[in-house]
C-alpha cells in the first residue's frame, strides 16, 4: 500500500494537482497535512484527505483524521496543536490514544521520518517554504507487512535519496 503525503503548500494549486496526477496510478491514498490555505472544496484538494493547519482559515477542515491503510492506522494532523516544534511526545501520545501506527504531520516545514517508541512519524516537509533543507518536498510511504519505507521527492518528482528511511513496524 502506497500513501502520498504532502503538507504546507501555502496557496499552491497547480503544484498540488501536478503531484497528485504524477502519482495517482501508484498510490492508494493521498494526504495533505494542512496549511493548504485553500477552500475546503478547492479542486486542487479533491484527491487529498486534508486536515486544518494554523494558516487554514477558509475551510472547515478537521484538526485530525484517523485513516486506515491496509492493516495500519494513520493519524493525520498539522502538528501545531501538539507543539511539534518543541516535542514529538504530545502527538505520539495522541496516536497512542487512537491506536495509530503512523503519524503524518507538517507545520515545521522540515522533512524527515523516524520511529518513536514503535510509531513511524513522518513530516513531508513543505512544497512551498522548506526549512533546514532548501528543497521543496513531499513523501510517499510504502507499507508492506511489518516494514515501511518512506521516500521523499522534490517538486519535480526526483527522489531525495538521503532522506529515504526503511523501518520495521
Swiss-Prot record:
Mn(2+) 1 binds at residues 8, 10, 35, 109. Pfam families: Metallophos_2. Mn(2+) 2 binds at residues 35, 54, 78, 107. GO terms for molecular function: hydrolase activity; metal ion binding. Its cofactor is Mn(2+). NCBIfam families: yfcE. This is Probable metallophosphoesterase YsnB. It comes from Bacillus subtilis (strain 168).
Amino acid at each position: 500500500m502506497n500513501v502520498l503525503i504532502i503538507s504546507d503548500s501555502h496557496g499552491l494549486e497547480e503544484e498540488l494537482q501536478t503531484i497528485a496526477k504524477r502519482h495517482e496510478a501508484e498510490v492508494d491514498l493521498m494526504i495533505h497535512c494542512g496549511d493548504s490555505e485553500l477552500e475546503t472544496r478547492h479542486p486542487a484538494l479533491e484527491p487529498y484527505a486534508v486536515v486544518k493547519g494554523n494558516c487554514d482559515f477558509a475551510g472547515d477542515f478537521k484538526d485530525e483524521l484517523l485513516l486506515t491503510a491496509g492493516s495500519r492506522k494513520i493519524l493525520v494532523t498539522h502538528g501545531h496543536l501538539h507543539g511539534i516544534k518543541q516535542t514529538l511526545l504530545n502527538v505520539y501520545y495522541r496516536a497512542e490514544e487512537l491506536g495509530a501506527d503512523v503519524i503524518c504531520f507538517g507545520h515545521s516545514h522540515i522533512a524527515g521520518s523516524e520511529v518513536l517508541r514503535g510509531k513511524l512519524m513522518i513530516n513531508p516537509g513543505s512544497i512551498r517554504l522548506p526549512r533546514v533543507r532548501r528543497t521543496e518536498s513531499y513523501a510517499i510511504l510504502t507499507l508492506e507487512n511489518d516494514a515501511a519505507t518512506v521516500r521523499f521527492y522534490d517538486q519535480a518528482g526526483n527522489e531525495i535519496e538521503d532522506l529515504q528511511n526503511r523501518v520495521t513496524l
